[in-house]
Amino acid sequence: MFAEDLDRILSGKYPGKSHALRVVELLREKVPNAKGYLYLEGRMSKLLEDSDEFEPFRQRRHFYYLTGCDLSNCYLLYDIDSSKSTLFIPPIDPEEVVWSGLPLSPQQGLEKYDVDEVKFSTELDNILSHLSGSQESTVYTIADQVCPHIKFGLDNVDSSILKGVIDRCRVVKDKYEVAMIRKANNISSLGHEAITKQASKASNEMQLEATFLGHCVAHGAKKMAYPPIVAAGRSGAILHYEANDQPLGGKQNLLVDAGAEWNNYASDITRTFPLSGTFTKESRQIYDIVYKMQMECIAIIKAGVRWEDVHMLAHEIAVEGLLQLGIFQGAKADILKAQTSLAFFPHGLGHYLGLDTHDVGGNPNFDDENKYLRYLRTRGTLPAGSVVTVEPGIYFCEHIIRPYLQDERHKDLINSDVLDKYWDVGGIRLTQGSIEDNVLVTPTGVDNLTTTIKHPDQLEGMIRGLEGV
């Protein structure tokens, strides 16, 4: 997608009303002829403990999905029968104006958000207490997300259905949502490339984290989708490493797992590269396996594919690669049956991406008896319009692998003498596009939203500052 097309899409309003119509459509699959109202509350402002400073604000995602409103202390009332959407915003507090300036007015809110009416929240209680409708009319809301003072004029209030319905809706993204994720990816990709170019000049992980954050903020993305992971050497085998404070000297590889948000929509990108500008023999061998895992998995993704099948393809390729290196020994079928590859690839292949990094609607089963599938955050067939991460990995984490070397089911399938050559590789993790990429599922394949390079030769060239990379 060209930049002008992206900007054109994002110049319009966030499509909250079309999302609401979709929610009602799915709601009526569960409750035929559902009548009444949808009621959602945004995140309320809250002080930090023992402080007069406010907590960092993060809007409730389901509220944002139906409004596009990123203000605190707001409410939404949606009339199912008339499809009328009313947003309630905070009133003007004269004492607060001197500190924070004038807040949004109802007219400004109507111009900014895809709603039919904007009122001050001082009118909310009266309107809710006088809601009317037929005997079947119900207020649909989300459990534990209704302020205690709220009283509805209708007797029927259901807080058990709406959240699950919105979860389902959020799986399939519209053009506006895809544009938001693409924008977040474009900015994050610039940050990743900046780290790669700066790596040879840095002495500590924190300097490279600062490089990423600086590039994202400079391009308008002030919020991160999750705390960045900038892990040198063996720290790369820690899946959610966050210290980012260790020296780079004497380390082979750097793993960077970092993604910015664009207006609450996440990116999730991972890249691994040699700090010296050249992979060691062992690192390149592992990188090539993971690169193959990712590329072959991406090649089979399209609407209707079972995510479990894609995940297992990654494990099969990992086993084949580690057998060729001599780290695994024995028959491929025996290794897969024993699930020994979990020692090196212990997490799921990827997850849905959207308003949350680990987005909703994946229906995971963390109690699955099949350990290969237990940590998959997404299960079942992928629909067109969903966005998933593709992040196979091979890790050399002693805490995980050592018990396998003592286990009767696994120890004869791993050659510990060969394994000893690879401990310093740490972790090589790829997702969709350039180690971990984010892909849009289409009827015939994928659209990779992640643009930063991932081919090992290109990575080495960028680190060394070669022309044309």
Swiss-Prot record:
One of its GO terms (molecular function) is metalloaminopeptidase activity. Its cofactor is Mn(2+). Binds 2 manganese ions per subunit. GO terms for biological process: proteolysis. The keyword Hydrolase applies. Catalyzes the removal of a penultimate prolyl residue from the N-termini of peptides. Mn(2+) 1 binds at residues 268, 391, 436. It comes from Fusarium vanettenii (strain ATCC MYA-4622 / CBS 123669 / FGSC 9596 / NRRL 45880 / 77-13-4) (Fusarium solani subsp. pisi). Mn(2+) 2 binds at residues 257, 268, 436. It comes from the Eukaryota. It catalyses: Release of any N-terminal amino acid, including proline, that is linked to proline, even from a dipeptide or tripeptide. Keywords: Aminopeptidase, Hydrolase, Manganese, Metal-binding, Metalloprotease, Protease. It is an enzyme of class 3 (hydrolase). This is Probable Xaa-Pro aminopeptidase PEPP. Belongs to the peptidase M24B family. Its EC number is 3.4.11.9. InterPro entries: Aminopep_P_N, Creatin/AminoP/Spt16_N, Creatinase/aminopeptidase-like, Pept_M24, X-Pro_dipept-like.
